[in-house]
């Protein structure tokens, strides 16, 4: 009989717990979905939020590792609550999505490529408004696609929540210490430091970010130095990605500027050393105005950074890889593949 206190037994119990929570979430979804429906089809568009205190863990196909050395005191997010996992209230392509929040122990999960290994790697930065991390919609589902293209995928679960407050005249203000950026920079250093063991080329490690994760990708692309004190040899590696893909990013455009102006927010740094960048955005995005991508793209161009921008009339916000009636949701993955070929990554 297996020892119930062994690491294997504890791991098995956590998998069972995760499965039970998924069932509970699904039950909550099915029960609540009757109230919010579209008039045209009767299909649900919103569901009741259900959350439970638990730590998000990757499935058996991923190798989940801590970002920071054990015992190192790192800054906690803006809450003492234990980590939670729950579902968003808005269905995406008729399906629920899962988030993690109150993350104080950030991790990265490595998913190996399927088929021939191109030795390229992509660090996935999900969105969630810096309040949560969209772990499946803009995380594991993205990694499923990336690994099918022969690339290693790394999913970052970064520290949240961290509020972007509104100060004088209700103007948004960036946090002084951006914890998600620290986690992203740490992950890039670890990936380069461990490149040979992960089977990746240390010069072909990029990022793909969604919504708030798009801003995080931009911040990592332009930071000239680390935003924390180095802790080990991994922090001697470059923390700048080799390429960057941003989908419907926010926190970039200065919304105080006239609508015709494309001025960046004061906290956005632009470096001539930023990597080749691809921006994808829908013009009717109700959450993060398309001007976030426009302003950032033009600033990169003015700095001499290679940048491509693809805008669609419709598509909304936070669709991930889930297909809807909007062409952007089905066409952007192939755009990314062709762009990666053009910049010499694949």
Predicted segment positions?
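N-terminal cap/lid segment of alpha/beta-hydrolase-fold proteins
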Residues: 46-115
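Cap/lid segment of the alpha/beta-hydrolase catalytic domain
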Residues: 129-138, 155-179, 223-225, 255-256, ...
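Short amphipathic alpha-helix adjacent to the substrate-entry channel of hydrolases
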Residues: 136-154
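Short beta-strand/loop motif that positions the catalytic acidic residue
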Residues: 279-281, 285
């Amino acid at each position: 009989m297996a020892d119930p206190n062994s690491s294997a037994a504890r791991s098995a119990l956590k998998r069972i717990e995760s499965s039970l929570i998924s069932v509970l979430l699904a039950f909550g979804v099915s029960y609540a979905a009757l109230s919010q429906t579209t008039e045209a089809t009767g299909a649900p568009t919103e569901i009741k939020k259900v959350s439970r205190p638990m730590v998000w863990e990757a499935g058996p196909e991923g190798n989940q590792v801590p970002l920071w050395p054990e015992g190192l005191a790192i800054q906690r997010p803006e809450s003492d609550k234990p980590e939670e996992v729950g579902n968003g209230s808005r269905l995406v392509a008729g399906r629920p999505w899962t988030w993690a929040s109150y993350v104080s122990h950030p991790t990265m999960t490595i998913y190996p490529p399927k088929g021939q290994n191109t030795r390229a790697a992509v660090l996935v930065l999900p969105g969630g408004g810096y309040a949560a991390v969209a772990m499946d919609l803009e995380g594991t589902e993205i990694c499923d696609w990336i690994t099918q293209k022969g690339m290693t995928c790394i999913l970052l679960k970064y520290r949240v929540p961290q509020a972007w407050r509104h100060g004088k005249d209700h103007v948004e203000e960036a946090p002084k210490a951006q914890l998600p950026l620290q986690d992203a920079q740490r992950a890039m250093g670890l990936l380069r430091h461990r490149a040979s063991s992960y089977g990746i080329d240390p010069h072909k490690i990029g990022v793909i970010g969604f919504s708030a994760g798009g801003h995080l990708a931009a911040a990592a692309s332009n930071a000239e130095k680390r935003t924390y004190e180095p802790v080990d040899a991994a922090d001697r590696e470059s923390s700048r990605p080799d390429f960057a893909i941003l989908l419907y990013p926010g926190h970039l455009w200065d919304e105080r500027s006239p609508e015709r102006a494309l001025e960046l927010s004061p906290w956005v740094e632009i470096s001539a050393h930023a990597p080749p960048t691809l921006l994808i955005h829908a013009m009717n995005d109700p959450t993060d105005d398309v001007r976030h991508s426009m302003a950032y793209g033009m600033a990169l161009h003015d700095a001499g950074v290679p940048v491509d921008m693809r805008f669609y009339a419709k598509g909304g916000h936070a669709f991930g890889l889930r297909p809807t009636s909007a062409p952007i949701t089905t066409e952007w993955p192939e755009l990314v593949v062709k762009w990666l070929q053009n910049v010499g990554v694949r």
